[in-house]
Amino acid sequence: MKVLLFCIVISLTTLIASGQDIEEELRCPGGYCVSKYLCPNGTFIDDIKHAQTTQLIGLRAGLDIDDFDDCNDYLLVCCQSAPAPTATSTEKPATSDELIEPPPSTNLACGQANEGGLIYDLRNNETLSQYAEYPWVVYILALKKQEANSGDFVCGGTLIHSRLVVTTAHNTDGKTDLVARFGEWDISTTKEPFPQQDIDVAEVIKHPQYVFNPIQNDIALLVLAENVQYAAHIRPICLPQPTDEFVGQRCVSNGWGKERGVYANVMKKLTLPVIGRANCTRMLRYAGLGPFYTLREGFLCAGGEVAVDMCKGDGGSPLACQTESGTYVLAGIVSWGIGCGGFNTPGVYVAVNRYVQWLNEHIVDQALNESFDIKL
């Protein structure tokens, strides 16, 4: 918290001292549009040097994704006090577009969530994650060859190492020029507090026994062209032990797929019960797969509750289960399902504990070493 506070104070002090011109587009009735974390309690912090420590420690800006105020962006607010404009500078002000440097990750252990998120407090929210709450979730896209810096969303993924992302194999079929985006939260805006990192995927390694139909061993590793830099909003998750079981536990799944028929802009957060293999097989038979269907060993099931389910667009996203110590491990990867959110129709996930040895072998093959234990 002290590091985060320091970064915010430095950002604000620089902003105030710069005397940058406030462009007309940032004006609003009675003030200027600034990022909400720069305007606590409705007024700009214009005297940082004399601000009470208690005013800044634990500072959190309330958010409502349906509240666009006069600034046409829910991450901005019309602030009643702002730095005085000058007549000479033409630079774009730091109040709305410049990102503060994220505090470095001082805890190098894997599986550490930012419980409750960072900086923002998203209100009136039941199925969306807080900002940076789950720092291992990855947004994977395919670059458009005809358009620079533009890409199409492909699937979700999970950071397990500074050079490795794990996802589903079927989502990478036929895909080239993949890029892994770290630190993403709301895909509809670029005004999040901390910068994202986009890193090219150098290699896709699919499980050697992967089969699309009937789907089996639906897991793939994305080898990054360079290491991702860990920060408070970008950290890896732990891998489970091969003997770990999660039946009966409620675990968290995240992604940007459909919810009630509409793709999510803000990363979702759904808490789902993990269901035993026999029970899941029975449910899937009744859901339409017939009396002879049996769930394969490489999968697990979660969900089965009405209108609470991962859906189209969530493939490759994580199912993270919390251990008694509070650490999160990657229990599953969203693979397939029958519809979305049907009663007694759970979603099917890759059972990561069945593939830990395979993942371990490739980490060793890549000669990738971390300074923390990734629970292999």
Swiss-Prot record:
GO terms for biological process: defense response to bacterium; innate immune response; positive regulation of melanization defense response; positive regulation of protein processing; proteolysis. The record marks 60-61 as: Cleavage. The gene is CLIPA28. This is Inactive CLIP domain-containing serine protease A28. One of its GO terms (molecular function) is serine-type endopeptidase activity. InterPro entries: Peptidase_S1_PA (IPR009003), Peptidase_S1_PA_chymotrypsin (IPR043504), Peptidase_S1A (IPR001314), Trypsin_dom (IPR001254). Residues 85-106 are annotated as: Disordered. Disulfide bonds join 28-78, 33-71, 39-79, 251-321, 280-301, 311-340. It comes from the Eukaryota. Gene3D superfamilies: Trypsin-like serine proteases (2.40.10.10). It comes from Anopheles gambiae. Inactive serine protease which plays an essential role in the innate immune response against bacteria, fungi and protozoa infection by activating the melanization cascade. In the melanization cascade, acts downstream of TEP1, SPCLIP1 and CLIPA8 to promote CLIPC9 proteolytic cleavage. In the susceptible strain G3, appears to be dispensable for parasite P.berghei ookinete elimination which occurs by lysis. Required for the melanization of Gram-positive and Gram-negative bacteria. Required for the melanization of fungus B.bassiana.
